[in-house]
């Protein structure tokens, strides 16, 4: 029977796709569906028919004529105009693996260069017989484009169809070998034709002799076997007078300085006249150099006496790695051949190059004569230019004269690597998460440890981030020793002394590790202790970090950077700006995430930003602003053998002026021509080589949108956020490979772990596209603008994978915010646009909501040209965004009866969710899902394999798409699903990734198959070797159900990923998903604060007076009855979103409005706020209502500070035993009442012996990693075993009856804040969480542990003066603290009233003026001046709600933060700090394992 596959169709870009039931490997089905009208003229249907009977339907965008030929595929990521005009494709129907073709339109096909050759093409026209693509972009945009790709194909009468699952087609060709095929239109039947039986070389060769570069000194005869124009250009450029002769021309009697044979298509063995002519040359006495390219390699080999064969799988693409056998140098090459030489080379000849992947011949050379040939294309176009140097070698042979061999003129390798002999390596982590330095370093550090262990190298890890996976002390993938200590030169030196490592890795710990390593180098510590920095040298790091050195280095190789000056004073900065001209950009040296950077349109802005920058660094760069240019990034890997690959290139949708961490980013780049792509790639490689990078680095470019002008912005000589994104986008494990390279292992010897077969020395091909969208939480920070710029503000990000931009873009928007349906003019969290919205300003000034403003502008019919003018976003992206809104409008005009299958399918293919569609059609989400499934529309599961299906893959790295026709995998494992945490944001950070990874690892240790779903590229849980199947997908009801049912999972764990998966518990349960652990109905009861409080009353468990309120009047009545302050809490939220302590009626009105918006479906609970109480955390694991593991930790701060911002102590330090017993008893009752089986957390207020419950979360909490590591019991391991019904030995667990309480050490967990990045935010703690990360350290007592933890957050112990500003009510308690600080030798400053009070109580203090009163009293110094000149290096600012000087206190806090000065705003923390400084004069470098060893020794 005939096998027919209906093609995918995709919106305006002419696409449409159809999902089908599970397919069998035999592909025995027959589907046929009508196309839909998308353009003004309905696209004609056509079929691609293969000789094995496979028939796939598509839609025409070329010439509507049938054609037959050989079907081949190309995995290149760009350069389709060059590829289509490559004569080597003569007679072939080309399948493009790149999922979107036509973005850049077609260039001027009549334009000629100075040689008379077609300027933008590789021959005189399109040479492919036909073209097959998945998605065709009819809307195009490029400054060189003159028409669409479809118009060009029609002009040249070449058929082309879109809507074919090209990945599926590639797999058929890969598995069965290249095969004959035909594109057939109805009524135009054609027979199969085998072009390999034709002498295609004769068809494409010139018919006459032609001369190019007439008068040039070197005469080169070029035999045209289908030569590409670029070969001629490169020869003339080097001084050749090129005589282009037909393939059968007798050149044996011609005089020449060099002979070149290049091409071409078909079977070279059919070109017998040419082979005989070459044979005459080889056997004659002629010694002029001969250079063969592609077909020329086989022609030369056949002439020499070797044999050729047709390859089962041709090499066609732009990422083929070849190895020079003579010197082990590897190169990435462009290839296009289906025949190869075998290993029958005669005497006198030997191989020159070999393919690293399939070991086929890639070049030959004569051992004594100047004859050589290569199978790949050194002239490229399209493709990488790595081997263009072979043309130089050819000319060197010509100049050297006769009798020279190619090896004598090939460039020698710059480096020859040797294995770095190290036995123990110290890896520096990045510390707690902060804006600009987040969870990506947990991922990279974990990969580095894994790589070292594979090579039998011992590892010592130093990282105080206790929530990270890498700091686990037990496990096959963990370091041999873990130090929870500050990443500072002092502590690293102590660890080096104690551990005596012989190697040090700096590139896996972000800017923190890099800066620390540079300082250790400068101090001579590394030299003193014989520690080698592995990978990139410190000198190279300094050259990338020091702005002047960086500029000098690039000038050495004449590379393009923006005109700039590195300055070390504000005066010089102003002079530099005057020289360059405004606007200018400033950047700080040794800074992270654009900290200390900004665009300065004028002198005033420069003074403001420059002053703040100099507070953080001693050097800034003032450079020309390239705002509005495109921002392009490359991730480059270089080994110690000087082999270089560019693993991924990425394009920022937002133009220059927005930090890449705050930009929407796509991979691969979508709007670059081949010339632009390769220009920037070549520059990347040159720069990385010149800087001496060994390992991985990121290079960022600004590219002019309408010319080839570019400049280098910066190089990061380390793993970065972009590196993590590139790793997850491509499947190429950059950190793992970089760690191997650091040991001196060359790239060709490292395996590609995804394919399991090929080498890591390659550049991934993507047959999908990725969109990254940042996650901001700017609303949490009072006073912070939503504007974004060159200094990063986002706290996390998501990555979505699709096969159209629209699909991945809409998925990413939903991943970022569960409240967002897709690309829509509605703001996240259902917020309203302001009534006085200035839409043009919203577009021209980038902000965290600009993407929604673009949707609003499109909805308002603003022209694309106007949006381009205001945003500088490439028009191609805006076309796609417009297509989404057009579909939205179409759907809104339909209902469930009138919506056709084609329209519904098209909506799904461009990323519409069921929920999104339901709102348009007036249905529920469940009804839309039912409608979709009824129409047999469902998604397909595809693999990320790094190779665009070119090689069979063992990968378990998956995504879901509606743009396909088959699944890539089988679904026969029925694993347990684990839901990850989604994007990092305030309140959900790396601790939930730790929980997910712990659960996954436990399941695998128990022999259970795992299916993980997450969408965060910074996580370890999205490392594909952590689980059995990884779905990089949305954490939405729709997508989880899709995957759960497709995989037929045995259950789903939702309690280890934080609030996002927890919120899905009830909806999943109602849709038949088996939720492991505590019943979702119980979770719902606990999450609804009013129900939970009612249950506590029934249990007679004490809590503060409370009331669930639905109206403002109810809230005001309750507050008046119990008295202010009150605590206002919405339900189903994480990290205290919209939670506030309310002190007045006005605040109640304001906060209640916000709370109802955050949690609209649930009532808000008001509780009487208990002042002066201490908060206690109970982290526990329940088993069928019994508590089998628990840990009790105490907050340093009194209640009122969110638990995520609190400083935790374990064991408790001030809580009475009586209160602890009450905490345990309440926990016991709650566990039983809610029948808890799994992890949970209860928060209590303790005041004396009174214990009140605050709230309970029936899921893992952010303190689980902290308590697990401190007590040495993995609570998530225990919880996972409970949830799946595994038996547990409870004797070793910290039960309520037999707690584990450390007696020889104290653990302190401290929060990390990112205030310097959040310009204008008030750095003070409230009920709503503000911290971005956490650290933990250990000490024999609370004081040493506390100081280590504070130092780990970047806190600097003051050396000079302390500014004290306290509200009057704090005075009685604060006097003792002030005395302690004075006795420790600190000079105290205070505002007038506080100063008078301190002096009156015999504590000397210098009075200073409030900021608002500066200059009024000449005898009072300016606080801001004292802070900025370093006289004050700690600010203690303790206001409360009754403070009069609200704004002054804010200015003081903000000045401290902006000046890089330590700031304390909580009395209890200040008190503990004063005690710690007094009692711990020195801080040791002991960590957890030291204390554990001591405890074990005592017990023994």
Swiss-Prot record:
Residues 1355-1500 form the MGS-like domain. Residues 39-218 are annotated as: Anthranilate phosphoribosyltransferase homolog. Expressed in hepatocytes (at protein level). Its EC number is 6.3.4.16. Signal peptide: none annotated. InterPro entries: ATP-grasp, ATP_grasp_subdomain_1, CarbamoylP_synth_lsu, CarbamoylP_synth_lsu_oligo, CarbamoylP_synth_lsu_oligo_sf, CarbamoylP_synth_ssu, CarbamoylP_synth_ssu_N, CarbP_synth_ssu_N_sf. Keywords: Acetylation, Allosteric enzyme, ATP-binding, Cell membrane, Glycoprotein, Ligase, Membrane, Mitochondrion, Nucleotide-binding, Nucleus, Phosphoprotein, Repeat, Transit peptide, Urea cycle. Residues 551-743, 1093-1284 form the ATP-grasp domain. It is found in: Mitochondrion; Nucleus, Nucleolus; Cell membrane. Glycans are attached at residues 537, 1331-1332. Its main location: mitochondrion. One of its GO terms (molecular function) is protein-containing complex binding. The modification N6-succinyllysine is found at residues 44, 55, 57, 119, 157, 207, 214, 287, 307, 400, 402, 412, 458, 522, 527, 553, 560, 575, 603, 612, 751, 757, 793, 831, 840, 875, 889, 892, 915, 919, 1074, 1100, 1149, 1168, 1183, 1232, 1269, 1291, 1356, 1360, 1444, 1471, 1479, 1486. One of its GO terms (biological process) is cellular response to ammonium ion. Residues 1-38 form a transit peptide. Pfam families: CPSase_L_D2, CPSase_L_D3, CPSase_sm_chain, GATase, MGS. The keyword Metal-binding does not apply. Residues 219-404 form the Glutamine amidotransferase type-1 domain. The type-1 glutamine amidotransferase domain is defective. PANTHER family: CARBAMOYL-PHOSPHATE SYNTHASE [AMMONIA], MITOCHONDRIAL (PTHR11405:SF53), CARBAMOYLTRANSFERASE FAMILY MEMBER (PTHR11405). Involved in the urea cycle of ureotelic animals where the enzyme plays an important role in removing excess ammonia from the cell. NCBIfam families: CPSaseII_lrg (TIGR01369), CPSaseIIsmall (TIGR01368), PRK05294.1 (NF003671), PRK12815.1 (NF009455), PRK12838.1 (NF009475). Can form homooligomers (monomers as predominant form and dimers). (Microbial infection) Interacts with P.berghei (ANKA strain) phospholipid scramblase PLSCR; the interaction is involved in the interaction between parasite sporozoites and host hepatocytes. This is Carbamoyl-phosphate synthase [ammonia], mitochondrial.
